[in-house]
Amino acid sequence: MNILSLRLKNFRNYKEAKISLSPNMNYIFGENAQGKTNLLEALYVLSLGRSFRTSHLTEAISFGSAYFFLEMTCEKDGFSHKLSIYVDKHGKKILSDQSPIKTLSQLIGMVPIVLFSSKDRLLISGSPSDRRLFLNLLLSQCDPQYKHTLSYYHRALLQRNSLLKTKQISTLSVWDEQLATLGAYLTLSRFTCCEQLNQLVQKLWNNSLSEHIRIKFKSSLIKQDKLSKESIIEELRKQLTSSLHRDLELGSTSVGPHREDFTLMINDLPVSQFSSEGQKHSLLAILRLAECLYIKNIHNVCPLFCMDDIHSGLDNHRISQLLDLAPTLGQTLMTSTHLPHQTLSKNSRIFLVNQAQVSIHSHSIIK
């Protein structure tokens, strides 16, 4: 799948704009606060129905406007498709070829996307919920059953927590059983995903042969000698029962997939404590590349790969590696404050953004 064009109306600092994209590299440069990141955000909102910059989409409406409208035209299997989203103070309306999309579950996965941005530092220094979100978004784009199971799990969790708060334990076992069955699928999916990402990350991380990079998945439900859905169901049943007294005191559920986490490790030491800032940034870029390859392996199609402000935190050597890999990653968008130093691949397109005006920039660095 390739995105042919992006249209924006009343989105951030864009009153109205339409951009035709290359199916390969799209390099977007310009000074700070001109609207480069807003273009990536628009694509992210269209793909996932949410922003990576705010939890309230209405905050992206241009000052003085009552709504924003975004539309992308895509090509898949030789056919053209349109995906649009309209947001105002009353809510949002999403259309796919003029047919309403009523839930985000329907939307997620239609246009797979991977974003590398400064907020990725939360995967190292943020809370467990930041890292669970990373896995949830990745798996939801690849596995329809995962996103539905995740939704049902959270509904069951809310019901159980409500009963715990009101000390109504007579029907608790019904929700315990649902959490155990649903939770086991989530945990096993996350564990398997981390193992596959580990293989991809290690192949991509060629900075030093002596460095071993891995994602250490942390779950009290995983027992290495009993790694199956059935064993995880049984373990979660036991933990829900044994933690009941504590859960009643807390008024919430203290065990389960909603407590899981992962740690990025280098040579079996936490990256958060034993790596330089440059090393951390490089590792996060590699993790996002691995995410692209993971989605490609599942869907047999490359996701849209967006990299924001690539010259912030990455050295020229790592940027060169990213640019060299870009042709194998499908459609890519990079933003920066200046032109690339490296030669871009054939059919790349360079855009200059100045005060929300986007123009094609011709430059000799394209082969």
Swiss-Prot record:
Main location group: cytoplasm
GO cellular component, one term: cytoplasm
Top-level taxon: Bacteria
Localization of this protein: Cytoplasm
Positions of ATP binding: G30, E31, N32, A33, Q34, G35, K36, T37
UniProt keyword Ligase present: no
Single Gene Ontology BP annotation: double-strand break repair
GO molecular function annotations of the record: ATP binding; single-stranded DNA binding
UniProt entry keywords in alphabetical sequence: ATP-binding, Cytoplasm, DNA damage, DNA repair, DNA replication, DNA-binding, Nucleotide-binding, SOS response
Annotated family: Belongs to the RecF family.
Record's function text: The RecF protein is involved in DNA metabolism; it is required for DNA replication and normal SOS inducibility. RecF binds preferentially to single-stranded, linear DNA. It also seems to bind ATP.
HAMAP family xrefs: RecF (MF_00365)
UniProt-recorded name of the protein: DNA replication and repair protein RecF
